[in-house]
């Protein structure tokens, strides 16, 4: 295998992307196309929302994976980290031919190395925070490109904002320590707790990964961190003793300084809050106090880049930021509103960890106190479910009705028989009075057609494929009108 590299100038370079339909890969394709690269790709035949993005870009996508997809002799191959040559003939052929290859995290690292780069990290909250920053970049006319891990609302289904090339801002993922390929000048750290149990053997293991990520900051690099999160406080304490040269900027309700948060409550489907260092109120149009914390982290980074580009922060800059937050509608699969029909509000959220589930449901309960909340949850990965079984069972307290399914398996793990969806169902029944189990997602359709009524909020939760249930039910009730 020949480790490839991406030069700062990719204009005219032929880049083939294996697994191009993934959210991150398609976003990277858009970024590379905008910089003049000749991009092609390959993937499975299944249709995803990223197909529309790739078609709009004019990127040829070949299906299925095949050695023939390399016939155009690409200069570089970038592949999703989900694929390895032992299981993907196309990637194995690229290795055999000696074509320079690199993974998606490695490609992101090369891009970050050539620019003033900022990484957004955290077990929870990094996607929404990055999406908020993307909209701020547009409104503030910052000379920056932003790569988000999901399609941003109001951004033409796209996961990227291309506003310039001085700054590069990206969502960076902790899974398998992928973010250690990134070269940040600034980091926003939203949350840290044990997750990805198929890779991280313990909480201490994932804590160490985040410590090493912070340690990649250069001398006098900036760390914006959510001091309300216990895991963040612990990793920052470790970093502070070994890296006293860094600039530490806390944000949250516990924070001192400019980004100390006071939350005032929900008003007209917006949460009002204020920051210690700024006059007046801010509003965020997403449910949950965690949305306020995400907004504050985004504000802190955006204002630091405003100072770097413009030399000062003006009233106009703050007005623009207030506007972004008040109008921000989230991103795909993050408290995403699918629509309302017959008085039933349909939503979808990617929350697949007990902490995320609890925060999401509590936020929805506060935002929509008059609605009954009906949740369909599909747990993702056997290892995560086994490790957090009790926590999952206790995470639905703010739901009125709960539907569970068989666990959505990860391609990267083998089921060992230790836990399944019925185990989660039996334990959840002890904690909640209305819990139902349907092994397959679509088996729940008749029950939900009869159960849902005017005034309900139906939300699909999880990283599985149960999100399709919302669309099926929405269309059913639409036809019934």
Swiss-Prot record:
Main location: cytoplasm
Sorted UniProt keywords: ATP-binding, Cell cycle, Cell division, Cell shape, Cell wall biogenesis/degradation, Cytoplasm, Ligase, Nucleotide-binding, Peptidoglycan synthesis
Keyword Ubl conjugation: no
Assigned EC number: 6.3.2.8
Pfam families: Mur_ligase (PF01225), Mur_ligase_C (PF02875), Mur_ligase_M (PF08245)
Transmembrane segments: none
GO process terms (BP): cell division; cell wall organization; peptidoglycan biosynthetic process; regulation of cell shape
Family: Belongs to the MurCDEF family.
The protein's name: UDP-N-acetylmuramate--L-alanine ligase
Organism name: Treponema pallidum (strain Nichols)
């Amino acid at each position: 295998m020949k480790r490839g590299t991406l030069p700062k100038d990719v204009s005219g370079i032929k880049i083939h992307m294996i697994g191009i339909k993934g959210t991150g890969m398609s976003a990277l394709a858009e970024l590379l196309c905008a910089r003049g690269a000749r991009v092609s790709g390959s993937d499975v035949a299944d249709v995803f929302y990223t197909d529309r993005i790739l078609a709009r870009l004019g990127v040829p996508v070949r299906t299925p994976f095949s050695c023939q997809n390399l016939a155009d002799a690409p200069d570089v191959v970038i592949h999703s980290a989900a694929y390895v040559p032992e299981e993907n003939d196309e990637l194995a052929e690229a290795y055999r031919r000696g074509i320079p290859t690199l993974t998606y995290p490695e490609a992101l690292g090369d891009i970050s190395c050539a620019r003033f780069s900022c990484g957004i990290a955290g077990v929870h909250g990094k996607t929404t925070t990055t999406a908020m920053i993307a909209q701020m970049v547009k409104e503030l006319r910052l000379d920056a490109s932003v790569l988000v891990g999901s399609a941003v609302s109001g951004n033409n289904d796209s996961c990227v904002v291309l506003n310039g090339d001085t700054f590069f801002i990206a969502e960076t993922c902790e899974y398998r320590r992928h973010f250690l390929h990134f070269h940040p000048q600034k980091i926003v750290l939203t949350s840290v707790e044990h997750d990805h149990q198929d890779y991280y053997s313990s909480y201490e293991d994932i804590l160490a990964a985040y410590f090493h990520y912070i340690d990649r900051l250069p001398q006098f690099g900036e760390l914006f961190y959510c001091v309300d999160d216990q895991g963040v406080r612990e990793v920052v304490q470790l970093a502070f003793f070994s890296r006293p040269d860094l600039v530490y900027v806390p944000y949250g309700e516990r924070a001192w300084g400019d980004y100390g948060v006071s939350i005032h409550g929900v008003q007209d489907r917006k949460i009002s809050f204020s920051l210690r260092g700024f006059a007046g109120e801010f509003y965020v149009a997403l449910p949950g106090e965690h949305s306020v914390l995400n907004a504050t982290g985004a504000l802190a980074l955006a204002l630091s880049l405003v100072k770097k580009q413009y030399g000062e922060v003006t009233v106009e800059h703050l007005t623009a930021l207030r506007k972004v937050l008040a109008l921000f509608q989230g991103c795909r699969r993050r408290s995403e509103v699918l629509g309302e029909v017959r008085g039933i509000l349909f939503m979808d959220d990617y929350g697949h960890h007990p902490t995320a589930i609890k925060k999401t449901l509590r936020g929805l309960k506060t935002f929509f106190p008059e609605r009954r909340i009906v949740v369909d949850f599909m747990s993702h990965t056997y290892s995560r479910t086994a490790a957090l079984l009790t926590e999952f069972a206790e995470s639905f307290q703010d739901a009125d009705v709960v539907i569970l399914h068989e666990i959505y398996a990860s391609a990267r793990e083998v089921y060992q028989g230790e836990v399944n969806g019925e185990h989660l169902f039996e334990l959840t029944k002890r904690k909640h009075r209305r819990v139902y189990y349907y092994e397959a997602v679509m088996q729940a359709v008749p029950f939900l057609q009869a159960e849902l009524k005017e005034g309900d909020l139906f939300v699909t939760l999880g990283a599985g494929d149960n999100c399709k249930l919302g669309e099926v039910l929405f269309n059913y009730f639409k036809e019934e009108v």
